[in-house]
């Protein structure tokens, strides 16, 4: 009899789980909708406005055990922004980070940042729908983030960055907004979102990827790129997204260099291999990347704008990556050489013969 009651109880609990999940999803969807409505009100745009970008960590953040992906549906329903239209991106964040929403209008340069109040998400759906915006969101900020505007209004930029108007997310959100407004490609922005922000290091990864793809194009299904990252910097996150060259699938091996080693091979940026897994052989390039190779326009304002401005002036070089890149060595790779470059205790630059 006791076992029977336990079984009935378990069945009832299992029956309740889908309903609880649906309730959580409805609440998150309503949250995304409220964020979009508030942004539309504050920025003065209508549904489907192609000038508007949305950035959010919805889908990454988990709030009191609730996943947050349904908030994206709420945004799309209200503002029309979507992943498919290339005007909604989800910068990567750890699941315990706050859930936030950011809307940017490139026609005005203005942006609104909203951070969810976790206490509001503990309400019933009916209670939640009745809450005013200042109880749904723990932080609501508005600022003009266009870099040209900020260059002429550094006092406003000082407030935005120094007072953390976007709760510490200022650099990444402002940089992504500005390159999106200037026509950055979808795949580049996807890689930027994976890195969780845009910086010149990610842009250098795009340049290197374009260069390698030109010199060592993939020609059949047996081929893939392998990366020996020595030294590593932000560029590696772009390779993982663009080439599926991840450490977990042995597509990337990351190693640091000492200051002395960096001096021995100036500007070295790693070893890039087109590997044929059927033939067990490949072609390799040891590359150098020199950020100072081109005399780019310089930012003259406060430090918060320097890398954002550099991101923008680097954009035209996507089609001219060789302006920054030098081939240090080209060589053939067999299985033994590849293993030596990948294995602990072996220095890949010494194996490649450049150190």
Where are the regions a protein language model picked out?
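Non-transmembrane, aqueous-exposed alpha-helical and coiled segments at domain scale
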Residues: 23-198, 207-355
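Bacterial N-terminal signal peptides that target proteins for export
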Residues: 2-9
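Bacterial N-terminal signal peptides
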Residues: 10-17
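Basic/polar N-terminal segments that are highly enriched at the extreme N-terminus
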Residues: 1, 20-24
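Short alpha-helix boundary/capping motifs
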Residues: 1-2, 14
